[in-house]
Amino acid sequence: MEITLEKALKEIEGNKFFKVLKENDLVKVSYRFNAPQTFDTPLKRELRGITFSSKTGRVVSRPFHKFFNLGEHPETEKERLKGKLFILREKLDGTMLHPAVVEGRVRLFTQKDFANPQIEKGEELLRRNDKLLKATRRLLEKGLTPIFELISPEFQLVIPYETEELILTEVRDNRTGHYLLEEAENELIQMGFKLPRKRVGTVEEAERLIEEAENVEGFVAKNFDESEPFPLFVKIKSPWYHRAHYAFTYLHNIPDHKLFNLFLNNRADDIFATVTNPAVKEKKSRRLKILTDIYHSLLSSAEKLSQLYGKVKEETLKAEAQKELKKIEREFKEELKLFNFPVEHLTEAARLAKQKKKFDKFLGTKLYTALKHQTVKLKT
């Protein structure tokens, strides 16, 4: 499929699911949201970071078209794929980078950026490997886009890679969009490119291979029986990766009230044990410790105040409770952005503690609510 900048812009006119990014003479078109209606035409499936020259309107860098997980889309339903033979390439858990020659220099881009730390790392790896840099330039000068996956311990998502590398995952013709890696595999290896591991098999065989595997994302399955508008590509992910990626995404994005709720429901250990990314685990563990320390301080204050409950006037108890809250606020001043915990909750917890009732559960629920409504808020 031949694409020009004019055709791409016309395709997404007035469509909030897509955005246009510009840098000097470069124009990048990519989707904002991955929703079912986003990719309702073949042309829209090409708009995943495709990059054009604003001067000529021609494609200068063409990453993958949008393809789907097994069972995610009518074209990837298992019944439809049954018995088909696929080239199975190892699916890597990194960052896709695609290059272009800009003002005589080979530059890398991600799907939605012209510059970010992953791009800097990828360009550094290219500079350190002269053979790879020259091979990349040769393909670009032929009107082809080598598509790389950057793997690096520095940018770990789920799988803990020990080395940092640029792996060539495909090569596309900028004009036609044809995929060329499989037919040019031997030549590409001789040029100095490293390719993902490969085997041939059915979807059923691929699923069996990764059924019990750990630290494996899965396969990109490719079938070239049809080529227009695209060959059939399918993402097949391991059960382990689905679980680990869910846990990673959940923990990475979890707000403080839900993080604290994991603790209240004794689920924190299960989630943390599944996440393989040490940076995310450390950050969220540190945050959860602050939340639980605040909670334990509230419990201690309630127990202390319970000794006064029934012996002093309500106003006096409330004043003492206010002092306890101020003390907690001072104790955690480096961590707290806001601490408006209602004094009534603390006096009620003191009453429950005095009566040997579940004041701990009561305070946990109230702190969860305060975090949810952001009357108690940690610094970022």
Swiss-Prot record:
Record's keyword terms, sorted: Ligase
InterPro entries reported in the protein's UniProt record: T4-Rnl1-like_N
GO molecular function annotation: ligase activity
Protein's UniProt keywords contain Oxidoreductase: no
EC number of this enzyme: 6.5.1.-
Keyword Ligase: yes
Pfam families in the cross-refs: RNA_lig_T4_1 (PF09511)
Function: Putative RNA ligase. Is able to catalyze the adenylation reaction of ssDNA 3'-terminal phosphate (ssDNA 3'p) to 3'-adenylated DNA (ssDNA 3'pp5'A).
Designated name of the protein: Putative RNA ligase
